[in-house]
């Protein structure tokens, strides 16, 4: 899918791939040239892209519900868009079939919506996911989405 996002100066852009790579780019250093691109293997693709700030956390979810949590300040900024990025899924786990199905940058109060293979949606507090280490689902996890805390406040008013 093609996503368009607006961002502010000094934010970081993160790309997360199916095979567990995390590529961080500094917004201020991005080129407008059309030849710049991310290099992936033939079997890999981007499952999530988002902007992140220093006060946010990064959540990554595998198809089996394992949650990987990182502070956004641990995001290494790549020197170029053609860099491979950080490896979050070790090669031994890749051989076992572990893959990322979704990722997001979250703040306190945000909610995470999880879609599983049975078609059910589950809404969880982002903070509870970081401590739990996994999500209980009725089937394999297909995707996740974020409901920002500030949008919940607007709806309530």
Predicted regions and their residues:
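Short, structured "edge-of-domain" segments at secondary-structure transitions
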Residues: 1-157
């Amino acid at each position: 899918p093609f996503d368009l996002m607006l961002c502010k100066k000094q934010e970081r852009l993160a790309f997360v791939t199916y095979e567990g790579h995390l590529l961080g780019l500094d917004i201020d250093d991005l080129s407008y040239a059309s030849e710049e691109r991310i290099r992936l293997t033939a079997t890999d693709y981007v499952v999530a892209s988002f902007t992140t700030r220093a006060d946010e956390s990064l959540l990554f979810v595998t198809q089996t519900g394992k949650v990987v949590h990182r502070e956004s300040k641990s995001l290494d900024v790549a020197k170029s868009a053609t860099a491979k990025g950080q490896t979050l899924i070790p090669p031994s786990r890749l051989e076992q079939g572990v893959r990322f199905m979704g990722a997001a940058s979250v703040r306190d109060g945000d909610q995470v919506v999880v879609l599983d293979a049975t078609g059910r949606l589950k809404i969880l507090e982002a903070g509870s996911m970081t401590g739990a280490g996994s999500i209980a689902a009725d089937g394999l996890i297909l995707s996740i989405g974020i409901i920002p805390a500030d949008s919940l406040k607007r709806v309530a008013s």
